[in-house]
Amino acid sequence: MPSFDTVCEANLVDVRNAVENTAKEIATRFDFKGTAASITIQEREITLIGDADFQLTQIEDVLRNKLTKRSVDVRFLDIGEVRKIGGDKVKQLLKVRSGIESELARKIQKLLKDSKLKVQGAIQEDKVRVTGAKRDDLQAAMALIRKEVTDVPLSFDNFRD
């Protein structure tokens, strides 16, 4: 029986490269000379540090540019609030999303059930496996999911015939 997996997974290698390129640009830009502006990544957490809020927004804009150039959707980033740290500096945490949340998985499953397509959706940890009798039904299900779920960057992999 043909099937595919619906996942929400960023390419962490490209994310890391984008963060490193952002750090290089911050080090060479004139408006960041002599400031505490920096960006680091540890696993799925990106840390921005700057002297003021506007510096954080500038660093975030540079990061968004670098991510876009590497074809990484910026909707993978969960942006945290700006916090003050010692010495008149501010810090912001960005988390890289991984996996489909259970609420969204249930929404996708209900969407498939209500669509009258001959497919079934099964929630498996952080992904949704869609199975159907025909390949055409699966392709219609992919199109339906792409059309209806726009707030999270979803991709389809593990297509089996």
UniProtKB/Swiss-Prot annotation:
Which organism does this sequence originate in? Verminephrobacter eiseniae (strain EF01-2)
Q: Name one GO molecular function term.
A: nucleotide binding
Q: What span is annotated as the signal peptide, if there is one?
A: none
- Keyword terms, alphabetized: Nucleotide-binding
| InterPro entries named in the record | DUF520, UPF0234-like_C, UPF0234_N, YajQ-like_sf
Q: Which NCBIfam families match?
A: PRK05412.1
In terms of superkingdom, the source organism counts as Bacteria
**Entry similarity comment:** Belongs to the YajQ family.
**Per the database entry, which stretches of residues form a coiled coil?**
none
Q: Name one GO cellular component term.
A: cytosol
- What role does this protein play? Nucleotide-binding protein.
A Pfam family of the record is DUF520
Q: What is this protein called?
A: Nucleotide-binding protein Veis_3464
